[in-house]
Amino acid sequence: KYMPLLMTAAGTIPPAKVLVLGAGVAGLSAIATAKRLGAQVEASDVRPEVKEQVESLGAKFLEVKSDSDDGVGEGGYAKETSDEYKKKQAELLEQRVADSDIVVTTALIPGRPAPILISDDMVKSMRPGSVIMDLAAENGGNCGFTKPDEIVDINGVIVDGTINIAGTMSVHASQLYSKNVSAFILHGYDKEKKEFNLEDEIVSGSMFIHAGEIVDERTKSAIEGSN
């Protein structure tokens, strides 16, 4: 299927409809790419404050009406939502998913399995030839049919659960990773004292173990829960 609107002597072909779930770094990049290719793009996120970012890229923001900041967690990251919110979200997405040619899912919750946003019934409502690209597959996926590192066909609908996508672009992935590691070290390391500044919130927020003790609360909870 073509992505952009095409007007030809033989008739008009409407643009592809792309739905992006999760408007973090990956989601915003997917929105920008789809718009650049000429698609009609909609996006949704549990954090209402990203609406401006989504709309600045030319996409329509699908907002779940809620009286609270239900999906906003510590540091502005997404968190687990209430059952009532999930019900409203499912009602909002049901028809949008059915109408989409491509669905890109990127929704993740720090320290938790990826939330299921696309039910089995939603997948079955999509047209044959439609594609779901589940970028959350490594954490379980946002689609019920997702199988990590596999591509499955559900009645003609392709569900792509490829993991480590960055590894397919290894040269640039390595460049970006090394640049970020260097920036982190240069920011947090005190050259004169030859030690990391533990009072820096970036350093302290990235630390798992110090002086032989687990200092990260999520890591501590996960270990205690497995015992």
Enumerate the predicted regions with their spans:
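Adenosine-phosphate binding glycine-rich loop
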Residues: 1, 6, 137, 143-227
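Glycine-rich phosphate/diphosphate-binding loop of Rossmann-like nucleotide-binding domains
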Residues: 2-96
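Structural motif
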Residues: 17-19, 39-42, 60, 101-103, ...
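Residue-level signature of catalytic and energy-coupling elements of molecular machines
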Residues: 34, 104, 181
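Short, solvent-exposed amphipathic alpha-helical segments in soluble enzyme
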Residues: 35-37, 57-60, 118-125, 148-151, ...
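Short, ordered loop/turn segments at secondary-structure junctions
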Residues: 46-48, 66-67, 108-109, 136-140, ...
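Catalytic or ion-coupling anion/metal-binding cores of large enzyme and transporter domains
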Residues: 64, 95, 100-107, 205-206
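ADP-ribose/adenylate-binding Rossmann-like module
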Residues: 102-160
